[in-house]
C-alpha cells in the first residue's frame, strides 16, 4: 500500500461527558486519550480497505460512504466472466494484501517489500505540516486497484466539486470526471479559502463535509454534516431557504430515533469538524444541554468521520422523501471512474445500468438535456429524477399521477381526473375508472384511493358507505360522518365527530359518552396524549391526523349551494337529544345573602331584593323582571308557582336558582345563563320572559366540558381572552369575574356580556357582576357610599373601653394583712388576657352535647321546624318563639358580651330578628348625641333613610352580636306588608354549637380620622377599623 499523506487522526478527550459505568470510562480513556497518539489504520476495519468517507475525484457529492472496492463475490464473478469470454487472458493471481503501513507503539516503521523501492514515503518522525489544503493519497487495495482521493486538510469529507456554482449538484458525465478536475480544482483553491482569518463560510464546504455549526446566537456549536438541499432536504427545509447559507443536519436525534434537526448556517457560524474539536467541546452554552446528548452526537460524528454513515444517510433520505434512494447505485457509479473496462463486464450491475442508462435524459418526457444545462438544473423530485423545465413546472403544479407517478406532459394522451380532497391528478385507468363512469364524475366529487383509505369509516345508517365520498345530492355539500370506529390501547370505541365524544365498547361503560382524554385514561394508555394514542381502526391513522385531513378536505370542498338550515322541529329534536344525556346535577345552596342573578348584596328603594317564600332565593326586582311586585311577604318565584313540577335549567347542571321559562315547552333557563348566551334574549324586557333563541345555539356549545363542574351538559360560554369553556352559572358561583358592558352605537344601546377564566382574572367568592358604562365601572364596593341605598347597617355603636393597667405595675398596699377589707375583683386578670370566648350556661359544666341533653327533656316539647310557611309574617312569628333555642349570650373573645349558638345552625338558616324601637332618622340622631354625652352604649340599626331601629333600651339579645371582618352571619331587611320592614340575622356559613355569632357592621368608610373606630376581631383579613 502506498500512502503519500500522513493518515493521522487525533480524537480529543471529552471531560464534560461523564459515563456512568467505570469500566466503560477506563476503556474510553484508553481509546480517546488526547495524548497525541496516532490512530492505527488496522484498527479502522474496512476504512483501510477503501471505505473512506468523503467524495472521490469523480465528484459525487451525494455519496458519503463510498465503497471503492467491489465485494469479493462480484470480483470472483468478474474474473470468471473474463476467463470465459477470453477478454482477459493470463491474468496473474491476486496477491495477498499486506497490513497497512503504520507506526507501532515502539516507534518502529515497517519496511516495504523491494517492489516498492521506487515509492516515495514521508518520514514518520517528522510531523511537518503542509501549507496546501489538499493532499493526495493513493491507496492500493486488496484487489490491485488504485484510486486517487483528494482529502482536505480540515476534514476527511471535504472534497471537491468541478464547478463552484454546482457545489450541491448531482451526477456528471463519466467521460468528464478527470479532464476538468485537475485544472479547475487547483485554480479555485484560492477562492475557497476563508475571506477572513479564522472564519469560514458556506463556500468553503461541500455536501458531505463534517462541520461544527450553530443554529442561533445563543445556541452551542454542534456536530453536523453538510447536505445537498435540493436532493437531501425535506420540502419544509427548502421552503425556508436562506441565501448564502449552507444546509446542515445536526448529529443526534431531536425526537425519536428517526428525527433529526436541520439548519441554514451563514458565515461565521460554521467551522471544520476535526480541526475545532478541542475548541468546541468546552463551550459555556453546553451547560444548558444534557451531556449525554452531546456525547452521542460527538460519537456519531466520529463514526461518520470514519465512514460509518449508513444510518445517517438512511434517515436523511427518508426525511427528504427519497424512497427510491439506492446507495449501491452511487457506489457503482464511483466504481466506473476506476475502470471503464470493468463497467462493461460487470454483469450484476447491468440491470442497474440499464435503469440509469442516460442520466442526462428527462425522467418525464425523456428529452435529452445538455450537460451544461444539467449542471444548472435545481428542480429534482423525490428519487433524484432529472427533469426539464416544462416537466419541473408541471410537477410543481401537481400535474403528476398520484398512482404511477408519471408526469402529465404533451406526449400523454390519457384521461385524467383530479381528487377533490388532496387536489392530485390521477390517470383514469390507474384507478380503473371506465369511460362511462368518467362522464358521471363531472357532476359529483371524486376522491383518490389514498383519501378513501384514510377516511374509511362506518356510518350509523350503513356500514358499507364511504364517508369521504358521501356527498349530499341536493347541494353538493360534504356531510360529516356520524361515527368512526377508533382504537386506543387495544380497546375499541365509537367516536362521534359532531360531539367530539367517544362511547367505549369495553362492555362495562354502557352508552355513556366520554371525552377523549377521559376515555384514554380508561383504556389504560400511558401516553397521556389522545391525539396520537387514539387511532382510526380502518386506516391506522392517528385521530389528530385524521381530523386535520378531514378539515383540509372540508376547506377544499366547494359547495355549489348554501346549505339549508334545519327546521325548528329538527333543531328541537337535536337539543332534546343533547339534554337526554346522563349527568350529575350540581346541588347549590341558595341563600338570601345576595342576589342570585347579579350577586350584589345591596338593594335600593326602587330596586329591592325580594325573597321567594318557598325556595328562599333572593333576587333584585330588576334582575328578575318583578318590578310590579308590591307584596313581598308572600311572593314566590316563577319556578315555584307549580311546586309539584321540578324545573331545571337546560343550559347548565346547577339545580335551583332564578329560573325563567323559554319559548320551548318544558325548558327553563337561569337568567344568568341566558344573559351570557349571545343567541338567547328575553321577549319581554319588563317581565324578562320567555327566553327565546335556545334553538339557535350552536351544537358545538353543547359538547364542551366545563372546567368547573367537569361535566358535559347544557351550553358553555367562553372566556373572552382564551378558549376556556365553562357554564355561566358555574362561573358565577365560583367567583369568576363577569362584566356587563353597556355601549351606545349609532344611537342604539348595545349590551355585551363578558367573562374571564381563572387564569386571566383571579376568582373571588365575593365577586359581583361589574357594570361597564361609558361613564365608568360600577361594582358593589363603588356604591357603598350611595346614601339612597337601603341597607342593613349598624350606623352607631358606642362602647367605652376601660384602659387596662400595665401587667408589670406594682401597687403599694398601705394596710396590713391583718385588716379585713372588701374584696375587689380585678377586671383584667391574668386569666382573661387571651380573651377567649365563653358562652353562658346556667347549668354548670357538662360532659355531653347540648343536643343529647335536649333529648332528655321529655317534659318540654320543642316544636319542629316547619318545612314551609304561607307568608313571611308567619315565618317571623315562628322565629321569635324559638330564638332562645338557637342562641344565648356569653363572654365574647372580641369585646364584652357576645352572642353564641346554642345548637348547630345551617347555612342560610334564619337565626333571630334584630328587634328594637323604630324611630325616624332625625330622632335617631338626637338619641345618639344624648347617648354619647352620658357615655352609654347605643345600638342603632338603619333600615332606610326614614326608619332606624333603636335597640339600646328596648332591644332583644340580638344587639349583643359583635363585629367581625370575617363574619358568619349577615343581616337582611324583610318586608312584612303595610310598608313595614324587619331586620333578620341569617347564617352565612355553618355555625357549630358554642361558636360566637358575628356580623359585619358595614359602617360608612368616609368617616374622619378622629372618628375611626378600631376593630378587635383579630381575623386574618381584619381591616383594622370598622369604618
From Swiss-Prot:
Subcellular localization: Nucleus
Organism, scientific name: Arabidopsis thaliana
EC top class named in words: transferase
Assigned protein family: Belongs to the class V-like SAM-binding methyltransferase superfamily. Histone-lysine methyltransferase family. TRX/MLL subfamily.
GO BP term, pick one: methylation
Compositional bias ranges of the Basic and acidic residues kind: 75-84
Zinc finger (C2HC pre-PHD-type): 646-680
Protein name: Histone-lysine N-methyltransferase ATX4
Segments forming domain Post-SET: 1011-1027
UniProt lineage: Eukaryota, Viridiplantae, Streptophyta, Embryophyta, Tracheophyta
Gene Ontology CC terms, in alphabetical order: Ino80 complex; Set1C/COMPASS complex
